[in-house]
Amino acid sequence: MSKIQATINNYFGTSFRRKLLDKFQQDHIQEYRGVVLDIGGRDRGSFKKPKAVVDRWIFADIEAKHHPDIVLDVAHMDVISTESIDVVNCIELFEHVQEIDKGITECYRVLKNGGTIIISIPFLFPIHADPSDYQRWTNHKWDNILHSVGFKSINIKPMGGFFTTLSDMVSMFINELPLILRLSRFILIPILSLLVRLDNTKLVKNNNTLNKFPQGYFIIANK
């Protein structure tokens, strides 16, 4: 596939949430360093993980069929030594973790002092089994649990908002239409792409109704 084809496919075929997630990861690419434990980190989206510039990139997954370096459950990481990891990468992971409190505690344990955890998590986004989907937490819940475990310098950023959530819902609806009607996405996606920009305006950010519709959160915290 050519670069132009990939760009077109990404523009018309990728959810607005995934595009946001790729951007957030790229904007914080400097956080990846040393030994990185990438839990559930199957390669998705257009973000290129900086595997070549870190000391070691360890791909861990609960399912062996994805060919991880280590098969493990984030809530039970006995195979990972205490304070041996510089960065724990948890992208779109914790909604699928049943024992989420234990998982966060384990991440804290394996991190070195000064180490970093990077989390992305959906909120107003469809239930999706991988293999199961257990929860959606608000920013207040995330702040409380991360503080209680011992994390510091917690930075929680909302991903998307009212118009991003609405646009993804419209896009998903289009995908369920008969083929001939699905062609309308070539007209609607450019319009929706403009619409999502409203989430970055004062119209939304300062509105006490419209600013309460995050699609998810991107979180960085330190041990």
Task: Describe the residue ranges of each PLM region.
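Conserved N-terminal segment of class I S-adenosyl-L-methionine
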Residues: 1-83, 87, 212-217
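Redox-cofactor binding/interface segments in oxidoreductases and associated redox assembly factors
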Residues: 38, 90, 119
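Short conserved AdoMet
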Residues: 52, 98, 112
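Surface-exposed loop/turn positions
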Residues: 84, 114-115
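A short beta-strand submotif of the Rossmann-like class I SAM-dependent methyltransferase core
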Residues: 87-93
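S-adenosyl-L-methionine-dependent methyltransferase catalytic module, highlighting the catalytic core
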Residues: 98-102, 106, 116-222
